[in-house]
Amino acid sequence: MKDLLNLLKSQGQVEEFDSIRISLASPEMIRSWSFGEVKKPETINYRTFKPEREGLFCAKIFGPVKDYECLCGKYKRMKHRGIICEKCGVEVTLAKVRRERMGHIELASPVAHIWFLKSLPSRIGLLLDMTLRDIERVLYFESYVVTEPGMTTLERGQLLTDEQYFEAMEEFGDEFEAQMGAEAIQTLMRAIDLETEVQRLREEIPNTSSETKIKKYSKRLKLLEAFHFSGNKPEWMVMEVLPVLPPDLRPLVPLDGGRFATSDLNDLYRRVINRNNRLKRLLDLNAPDIIVRNEKRMLQEAVDALLDNGRRGRAITGSNKRPLKSLADMIKGKQGRFRQNLLGKRVDYSGRSVIVVGPTLRLHQCGLPKKMALELFKPFIFSKLELRGLATTIKAAKKMVEREEAVVWDILDEVIREHPVLLNRAPTLHRLGIQAFEPVLIEGKAIQLHPLVCSAYNADFDGDQMAVHVPLTIEAQLEARALMMSTNNILSPASGEPIIVPSQDVVLGLYWMTRERINAKGEGMVFADTMEVSRAYYSKQVDLQARIKVRLTETLIGAEGERTSETKLVQTTVGRVLLWEIVPAGIPLEMINRPMVKKAISAVINYCYRVVGLKATVIFADRLMYMGYDFSTKSGSSIGVNDFTIPAAKADIIARADAEVKEIETQYASGLVTQGEKYNKVIDIWSRANDLVAKSMMEGISKETVINRDGVEEQQSSFNSVFMYADSGARGSPAQIRQLAGMRGLMARPDGSIIETPIKANFREGLNVLQYFISTHGARKGLADTALKTANSGYLTRRLVDVAQDLVVTLQDCGTDSGLTMSPVIEGGDVIESLGDRILGRVVARDVIRPGSDEILVPAGTMIDEAWVGRIEEMGIDEVLVRSPITCESRNGICSMCYGRDLARGHRVNPGEAVGVIAAQSIGEPGTQLTMRTFHIGGAASRASAADSVQVKQEGTVRLLNVKVVSNPAGNLVAVSRSGELAIADASGRERERYKIPYGALITVKDGETVKGGQIVAKWDPHTHPIVSEVAGTVAFSGMEEGLSIRRQTDELTGLSSIEILDPAERPSAGKDLRPAITLVDAKGKELFLANTNVPAHYMLPAKAILTINNGDIINVGDIVARIPQEGSKTRDITGGLPRVADLFEARRPKEPAILAEISGTVSFGKETKGKRRLIITPTDGQVLDDGSTHYEVLIPKHRQLTVFEGEMVAKGEVVSDGPANPHDILRLQGVEALARYITNEIQDVYRLQGVKINDKHIETIVRQMLRKVEITTMGDSSFVKGEQVELTSVLEENEKLRAEGKQPAHYERLLLGITKASLATESFISAASFQETTRVLTEAAVTGKKDNLRGLKENVVVGRLIPAGTGLAYHNDRKRRREEALSEQVGVSAEDVEAALTEALKSSVS
């Protein structure tokens, strides 16, 4: 009995481990795992179904087929446990040992492991310093390799063909040795002395000048060091013994009809064994060399196929022409071991069904069909039935449940009470896709879902299905209730705004009841209290929308929680009073006393959560919903065709637009405007017409004229159903109403360019055939886009989660005082995001001081909450330095001060919060809402008619920001820089508006001038790109030959001639090399220089440019030399939507990036090469640069427009040539903060366009993970190699140690890695391997003998432990503490202690 108990105890024990190591297996190790050698290719006997002896399923090697039974049947049952049968040699034990016992195959000739050979970079190749081609020629018996040169002229590792080998034999006899095949490779690897090689390379690297050589050496050095330190031996990459997988992991299952279903591995193993046995026989027979060689090659190929089929040559196929699934295929890919079984598992105790709406539920409830509940809670019911004595055995209980006896239902009610269940809707894009509810039993078969959680699940009731899961353990129930309950998830973790917000019909009801109607029944009545109002309303004495006065009490809650009440008489409507009755105390009346559109309702719920508290908010949200449904039913709003009133002005507007278009067509016909200009202008006209129609239509729908009490006509907001739907935010938008009642407007072709002829009809009038055909393009593209988008968005989320999964809040405070400077986002005349919104929920890094004094306004370490935001807005502060995840100095994880507020809870983030995963989900979840399309410039024109001037909105002072200007004779400024901006500051000096000023714009004000609202301060022609002269002088042409490089055109109407530069493609061969340009000369014909420089005033003219001046004309400063039609100058596609977000996170370099100044200094131009210009920057202080030169130079293609002139001063990181920014350059030249700002702003732009709110800190969290690695620039006394990529934390740790010992620390440069690269470069090989490129990651990890400390979430999921985040953090901290205690207590244990412990254990086990 004791035996049995011990056996059971040993079965249940879990091994505790702290890390996992992966390394190469030596032949001895493989033999030690093995339980015997597999010698025959047979599997099982097809008559008796018994495994063949010494075959692939042999019971002697792998264990018995049936529990406690040997193969021949001599020993059966438990009592013979552990005996080895003398007849058949099988140990009597559990059959499940066939899942863990391995065998082996002794190979007759060594075989190279294909992973270390072919997975790039080839490890064997690096080690032997040979190319992969050469090694393959040796391995597959095409040439000899010299393994021991002896005293000859040959070198070790030299390849010899057959002829060369025989010649060498004749010449040197047996002075030297040359071999072929894997043995040769093995011999070469044995000969390597790791230590001396490492020493040699370490000395060689500093003495090498060529970059490529250093790269090669440091790669090889890294590999050699890895072998040296990990204890792996290089020759183990060639196998002499092949392990055999346990048979139950490659099963052979008999099907009916005498056929077998088998794992592909068995076929692959059979080939290996067959070839191996044949090779053994050939060697015994001393067969001719050529035959043996062929057999060895075939063995090598068979083993290759077993390990990784298809990696080399053609994949071996089975009987059905399908490639066989090798060991490598088992672990990689979506269906592989990692992603299918370790990271994604099926869940027991779950069910799924269609969802229907449950408008009567409370927020924390869901309706669960009785049938489902009975099935899901079966074990609980069984135990209750037994406990009550209603059933004697489980079997009897089962019977009762199957018969559905009455008592079972009573027990089910009890079991379910206060037992939450989890509801999940696929796709689970963020953590709100799984929430906990208390089940309410219902009849029927559909799950009832509370309407307010639909937006979190993104669910609708058109046939969606949801899954139910039952948390079994008490801990799971507790977590479900405390963390996952729908009532605890009011705020969205992405933006911190409420996500439990009424939508659609509820909004419509609340909006309708809070509207005013002039001259409704009971208008002007005065009531004593709210009760009287509802009595009057329900007895039909007063209308719901009537304006009345009522006396009510308003309670307000201050910042410290103190309550103040005030009773007053207020002007309001009946509906608003009814709504006021359900509003919790503490909410001001003015939040309710207005038409409740969706935004207003959201604001009330948000305020309620922040000020009144969670419980009140939940109750309030529920009551809002009930009331909304009630009144939307009473409103009886519906749509008829006549609700879409077509504006009277429409015909007139369209006629005017048509006339304008005709005008432009005639201009085009007579050659006054180019094709591109015509296209742009036409589209502009129609965009404007469309907007006008829409405006007049909305004016018609949104207002109605009524007679008021005094019999006078008065305008009020209309009660048109369509208008109410759109205005309340319930459904539809002005853009959709425009298509129904205005005009459909311009349509896009499938490639995104806009068709010139708009659809003038609307849906109420109906489309004709042509119009319908045009509009099908867009509809189809929309559907195709959606399908592609979903997959792309899912992949982006997966990469984001993978890169950020191990980022958890571990510390309270890392103590840093660095951070990011936050300022408001201003575009054009609007503040898009105020400073308050940006810093809400952040911690201030340093004291904010009032400008011009030393008064501290906000002390460092303050968490900015809503109250502080109000104060900061009043103080007129322009920017605040806040702590950020990017600058957090915690070694692993992140501290809660740098992260700030937990957005979903509204207080400071708790240690253990998995902020990385939350960030990834918040960015990935709205991915499906982003567009896939790339906007062409034409598309941009359609979105807004092209801007051609800057009109100021409010009064203020002008600030010109990095604009270079020249002033023309009229005294106006002309902008000659491309990235200039003009800002307007208000009286207190805060920036309120900001506009981009394009090249060639006329600026009519000076810097610092005061302007009034509505004043136009700059204007330009939006359809052409000018080239502006910066000096006055005489025009001299060069490279302008008529008919070769230019074409003269004379206008019939005006008689003016213009010159057009031909595109090189259109020129005759003689003109191909001409470079048309204009030089400005003085009266004597000498070249003029640009002001204060020695750069000639020389303008290259691009193709398609149009000149209106002639050779010898005299021009002034600021005059336009040439115009380039806008479509002619290179229009860059603006990548929008999802691809743009992916590009930013992958840190991709754009095609033609902006060129930045690498150092600060003076610009000059060197000798030009063909097609390139040489830009030279000389440091002003004359210091010598790192590489020893006195200046920095870069070659820039001629077609790039430069923004700097000779002699100009540039600062490091300033733009020299325009283009999209390259994030790597920003990091290198401007630092981490500039990079963070760039990436955050760019990504926010994309999301903002779609109206998605995401908090900046999620993006910063991902950027932190992208900045984990550094590149070593100088080694110092560290163990790092120059040019090596290392984790930042490990460099910091090593440098600390070196400084403590007074040695030289290593210097490094921060690196920016794309999210895919960063995921693959994590410390943890388990996490990287389960992400992508499994083979490569595992190969590298094995060679370097990597140890995975299981720090992240993914690794712990894979090994099946609690994750070190959330509630699992306590378990991990506890284990850490126990480990430390154990280390400190490792003092000897006496024999008596052991004995006492044993007796104690036995006692407890017997009892």
Swiss-Prot record:
<dbReference type="InterPro" id="IPR007080">
    <property type="entry name" value="RNA_pol_Rpb1_1"/>
</dbReference>
<dbReference type="Pfam" id="PF04983">
    <property type="entry name" value="RNA_pol_Rpb1_3"/>
</dbReference>
<dbReference type="InterPro" id="IPR012754">
    <property type="entry name" value="DNA-dir_RpoC_beta_prime_bact"/>
</dbReference>
<dbReference type="InterPro" id="IPR000722">
    <property type="entry name" value="RNA_pol_asu"/>
</dbReference>
<comment type="subunit">
    <text>The RNAP catalytic core consists of 2 alpha, 1 beta, 1 beta' and 1 omega subunit. When a sigma factor is associated with the core the holoenzyme is formed, which can initiate transcription.</text>
</comment>
<keyword id="KW-0479">Metal-binding</keyword>
<feature type="binding site">
    <location>
        <position position="462"/>
    </location>
    <ligand>
        <name>Mg(2+)</name>
    </ligand>
</feature>
<feature type="binding site">
    <location>
        <position position="464"/>
    </location>
    <ligand>
        <name>Mg(2+)</name>
    </ligand>
</feature>
<dbReference type="InterPro" id="IPR007081">
    <property type="entry name" value="RNA_pol_Rpb1_5"/>
</dbReference>
<feature type="binding site">
    <location>
        <position position="898"/>
    </location>
    <ligand>
        <name>Zn(2+) 2</name>
    </ligand>
</feature>
<feature type="binding site">
    <location>
        <position position="814"/>
    </location>
    <ligand>
        <name>Zn(2+) 2</name>
    </ligand>
</feature>
<feature type="binding site">
    <location>
        <position position="460"/>
    </location>
    <ligand>
        <name>Mg(2+)</name>
    </ligand>
</feature>
<keyword id="KW-0808">Transferase</keyword>
<dbReference type="InterPro" id="IPR006592">
    <property type="entry name" value="RNA_pol_N"/>
</dbReference>
<keyword id="KW-0862">Zinc</keyword>
<feature type="binding site">
    <location>
        <position position="85"/>
    </location>
    <ligand>
        <name>Zn(2+) 1</name>
    </ligand>
</feature>
<keyword id="KW-0804">Transcription</keyword>
<dbReference type="GO" id="GO:0003677">
    <property type="term" value="F:DNA binding"/>
</dbReference>
<dbReference type="GO" id="GO:0000287">
    <property type="term" value="F:magnesium ion binding"/>
</dbReference>
<dbReference type="InterPro" id="IPR044893">
    <property type="entry name" value="RNA_pol_Rpb1_clamp_domain"/>
</dbReference>
<dbReference type="InterPro" id="IPR045867">
    <property type="entry name" value="DNA-dir_RpoC_beta_prime"/>
</dbReference>
<feature type="binding site">
    <location>
        <position position="72"/>
    </location>
    <ligand>
        <name>Zn(2+) 1</name>
    </ligand>
</feature>
<comment type="function">
    <text>DNA-dependent RNA polymerase catalyzes the transcription of DNA into RNA using the four ribonucleoside triphosphates as substrates.</text>
</comment>
<dbReference type="GO" id="GO:0006351">
    <property type="term" value="P:DNA-templated transcription"/>
</dbReference>
<feature type="binding site">
    <location>
        <position position="88"/>
    </location>
    <ligand>
        <name>Zn(2+) 1</name>
    </ligand>
</feature>
<dbReference type="InterPro" id="IPR007083">
    <property type="entry name" value="RNA_pol_Rpb1_4"/>
</dbReference>
<dbReference type="Pfam" id="PF04997">
    <property type="entry name" value="RNA_pol_Rpb1_1"/>
</dbReference>
<dbReference type="GO" id="GO:0008270">
    <property type="term" value="F:zinc ion binding"/>
</dbReference>
<dbReference type="Pfam" id="PF04998">
    <property type="entry name" value="RNA_pol_Rpb1_5"/>
</dbReference>
<dbReference type="GO" id="GO:0003899">
    <property type="term" value="F:DNA-directed RNA polymerase activity"/>
</dbReference>
<dbReference type="InterPro" id="IPR007066">
    <property type="entry name" value="RNA_pol_Rpb1_3"/>
</dbReference>
<dbReference type="InterPro" id="IPR038120">
    <property type="entry name" value="Rpb1_funnel_sf"/>
</dbReference>
<keyword id="KW-0460">Magnesium</keyword>
<feature type="binding site">
    <location>
        <position position="895"/>
    </location>
    <ligand>
        <name>Zn(2+) 2</name>
    </ligand>
</feature>
<feature type="binding site">
    <location>
        <position position="888"/>
    </location>
    <ligand>
        <name>Zn(2+) 2</name>
    </ligand>
</feature>
<comment type="similarity">
    <text>Belongs to the RNA polymerase beta' chain family.</text>
</comment>
<dbReference type="InterPro" id="IPR042102">
    <property type="entry name" value="RNA_pol_Rpb1_3_sf"/>
</dbReference>
<protein>
    <recommendedName>
        <fullName>DNA-directed RNA polymerase subunit beta'</fullName>
        <ecNumber>2.7.7.6</ecNumber>
    </recommendedName>
</protein>
<dbReference type="Pfam" id="PF05000">
    <property type="entry name" value="RNA_pol_Rpb1_4"/>
</dbReference>
<keyword id="KW-0240">DNA-directed RNA polymerase</keyword>
<feature type="binding site">
    <location>
        <position position="70"/>
    </location>
    <ligand>
        <name>Zn(2+) 1</name>
    </ligand>
</feature>
<dbReference type="GO" id="GO:0000428">
    <property type="term" value="C:DNA-directed RNA polymerase complex"/>
</dbReference>
